[in-house]
Amino acid sequence: MENKPLTPRQIVDRLDQYIVGQQDAKKAVAVALRNRYRRSLLDEKLRDEIVPKNILMMGPTGVGKTEIARRIAKLTGAPFIKIEATKFTEVGYVGRDVESMVRDLVETSVRLIKEEKISEVKEQAEENANKRIVRLLVPGKKKQAGVKNPFEMLFGGNQAANDDEADQQEEASLEEKRKRMAHQLALGELEDHYVSVEVEEQQPSMFDMLQGSGMEQMGMNMQDALSNLVPKKKKRRKMTVREARKVLTNEEAGKLIDMDEVGQEAVLRAEEGGIIFIDEIDKIAKNGGASSSADVSREGVQRDILPIVEGSTVVTKYGSVKTDHVLFIAAGAFHMAKPSDLIPELQGRFPIRVELSKLTVDDFVKILVEPDNALLKQYQALLQTEGISLEFSDEAIRKIAEVAYHVNQDTDNIGARRLHTILERLLEDLSFEAPDVTMEKVAITPQYVEEKLGTIANNKDLSQFIL
């Protein structure tokens, strides 16, 4: 967690840089995060009693449900995973079991902490890597192995002394060469020289066939056990000094990091700061109470998710993980089902409910221009690489937003994702011709938008297939 936790207002302000509108959802998530910090300041007895208030987000696709959770995780540096409820099956059926979401969370936590530890030891690792590169550039003489014959040992005393003296001189000469080479390396004069580096051979896992069968965890555990018994194969690869430095720095960093400590920290961070985003939760709700063989395991999946959400212990290869204080954010469009179609026990585990509103024309205008790295900025940057400066008039931006809104209303509402389709269609010809034309500046006007999109947008049948 951050040393200086953000206040709820600061969190909302940060989210506003990337996501337009949806203030209720932003506030709910901001308060949930701040409560984690407040809880950490309490004494241990009371701290154990306070559990996070899980959030259920309801709203059509493409309005920012997933993005809010993803941005929150980046802001806090918390382990975050997004999973889809439809991927899981009830115990007894072929497929992933719900406990795998906790194992995935711990793996994410391990990766985060490993990256932090690597950044801490990066200087030392680079220094060690440079020393190895110098030894590769100026290899030492291989010592003669083998037993001398007895007569040589008895009568060749002077020869042995001479050999030792020659070895010392050679060693001194070698050290001098390596010092010169290290100096050249520090100046960056040897970056394109080639060296032969011994690296671990990446072999396909024999347990890949278990993926998606619900037995992948067993496969991973067996693979770990076997990797400790069987030494890893190594092969020599020829690469530039620049590439070798990256490979060897990673190797050296791995030697400096205590993976047992990383595992312990990862479990603790996953328990205290983990966020699990369960998408498409409406798809496992029973629709209208009618049951069929096709959705026989929907309620079973809900019942399997229930103990994870309310707090249980899951065994992972890094240790046991308690889910009591993991924050769960569930989301769904709920256009075919209602939150009340979920089993009552699961409904009770998501006390905070937030409805995200549909996007208006004004929202589409803001999405196009306001966020950091907004869509229009992305397209402008892409075409700038071809030497074309792309400019959108305010009226053209408004027109694009109106087209996106009306197509959403007339066909399926896919929210802000509709803008990707609209802009690709609008700029298709320009993107295709860009490398071959000599235009420096292109202005996108309402007339241009109407010319490219008007016919398709106004024809409901066409827009269903093209936009």
From Swiss-Prot:
Signal peptide positions on this chain: none
Ribonucleoprotein found in the keyword field: no
Main localisation, per the record?
cytoplasm
**Gene Ontology MF: a single term:** ATP binding
InterPro entries in UniProt: AAA+_ATPase, ATP-dep_Clp_protease_ClpX, ATPase_AAA_core, Clp_ATPase_C, HslU, P-loop_NTPase
**Sorted UniProt keywords:** ATP-binding, Chaperone, Cytoplasm, Nucleotide-binding
According to its UniProt entry, the function of this protein is described as:
ATPase subunit of a proteasome-like degradation complex; this subunit has chaperone activity.
Q: Return the NCBIfam families for the record.
A: hslU (TIGR00390), PRK05201.1 (NF003544)
Family (UniProt): Belongs to the ClpX chaperone family. HslU subfamily.
Protein name (Swiss-Prot/TrEMBL): ATP-dependent protease ATPase subunit ClpY
**Could you tell me which species this protein originates from?**
Bacillus velezensis (strain DSM 23117 / BGSC 10A6 / LMG 26770 / FZB42) (Bacillus amyloliquefaciens subsp. plantarum)
